[in-house]
Amino acid sequence: MKYQFNVAMACDGCKNAIDRVLTRLGVEDKSISVEKQEVIVTTDKPYELVEQTIKKTGKEVRSGKVLE
């Protein structure tokens, strides 16, 4: 499954924090853009689990959707 999230990020530190938690979750295929405030992941993990994992960084997940 491929998911897209709109996440409030201010800097590369925010990006790195999200990258770390997603890597720990086992998500290898990911794109994180501070400029677009966007996180796109391709994984077999459930949507809710990925969303909650991103929220654990303290960042606001403004919206999200399943792309495919």
Curated annotation (Swiss-Prot):
Keywords: Chaperone, Copper, Copper transport, Cytoplasm, Ion transport, Metal-binding, Nucleus, Transport
Top-rank taxon, per record: Eukaryota
Keyword Acetylation: no
Stored PROSITE patterns: HMA_1, HMA_2
Gene Ontology MF term list: copper chaperone activity; metal ion binding
Stretches assigned to the HMA domain: 1-62
Location of the protein in the cell: Cytoplasm; Nucleus
Positions contributing to Cu cation binding: 11, 14
Keyword Hydrolase in record: no
GO terms under cellular component: cytosol; nucleus
GO biological process, one term: copper ion transport
Main function: Shuttles copper to the transport ATPase ccc2. Protects against oxygen toxicity.
Family, per entry: Belongs to the ATX1 family.
PANTHER family according to UniProt: COPPER TRANSPORT PROTEIN ATOX1 (PTHR46365:SF1)
Protein name per its UniProtKB record: Metal homeostasis factor atx1
Organism this protein belongs to: Schizosaccharomyces pombe (strain 972 / ATCC 24843) (Fission yeast)
Upper classification of the organism: Eukaryota, Fungi, Dikarya, Ascomycota, Taphrinomycotina
Gene: atx1
